[in-house]
């Protein structure tokens, strides 16, 4: 089964390195897998200020974060392939990659996969859910040719 993906990538900031549209599409397609035949998704790349504002508004945390996921929930009688939105803070991803001694590409891939899994309903609040989500993330990231994102360097 192949995924018919409509991906809108919004660049609201600049940085030294960003994934290509093709990389974003590969990572989203990998994360979504066989969960759906058709999907629409927006990835918005933002600066620290916008990330902090959104994180404060929607999560009550007054600091920028790496990725925020906003799933779209249509009324039950309406079928739309709209999965939702990911908001990724380029500066946080760059800082985390450096701190964790990962390549930017590997960490961006991880953030996209992580965010997509949230859009699909996965979470990591409870320990059991976290184990399931991290296991799936690791499997998907390794399938993309990167190392386990949770393995200590």
UniProtKB/Swiss-Prot annotation:
- Location in or out of the cell: Cytoplasm
Annotated Zn(2+) binding lies at 114, 118, 124
Cofactors (names) = Zn(2+)
EC nos? 3.1.-.-
Instruction: Give the record's keywords alphabetically.
Output: Cytoplasm, Endonuclease, Hydrolase, Metal-binding, Nuclease, Ribosome biogenesis, rRNA processing, Zinc
Q: Quote a single Gene Ontology cellular component term.
A: cytoplasm
- Explain how, and how many, cofactor molecules are bound: Binds 1 zinc ion.
InterPro entries per record: MetalPrtase_cat_dom_sf_prd (IPR023091), YbeY (IPR002036), YbeY_CS (IPR020549)
One Pfam family linked to the record: YbeY
Quote the Gene3D superfamilies the UniProt record gives. Answer: Metalloproteases ('zincins'), catalytic domain
| GO terms for MF | metalloendopeptidase activity; RNA endonuclease activity; zinc ion binding
Q: What processes does the entry annotate via GO biological process terms?
A: rRNA processing
Q: What PANTHER family does UniProt report for this protein, alphabetically?
A: ENDORIBONUCLEASE YBEY, CHLOROPLASTIC
Record-stated family: Belongs to the endoribonuclease YbeY family.
Function in brief = Single strand-specific metallo-endoribonuclease involved in late-stage 70S ribosome quality control and in maturation of the 3' terminus of the 16S rRNA.
Q: What is this protein called?
A: Endoribonuclease YbeY
Q: Taxonomic classification, please? A: Bacteria, Pseudomonadati, Pseudomonadota, Gammaproteobacteria, Alteromonadales
The primary gene name is ybeY
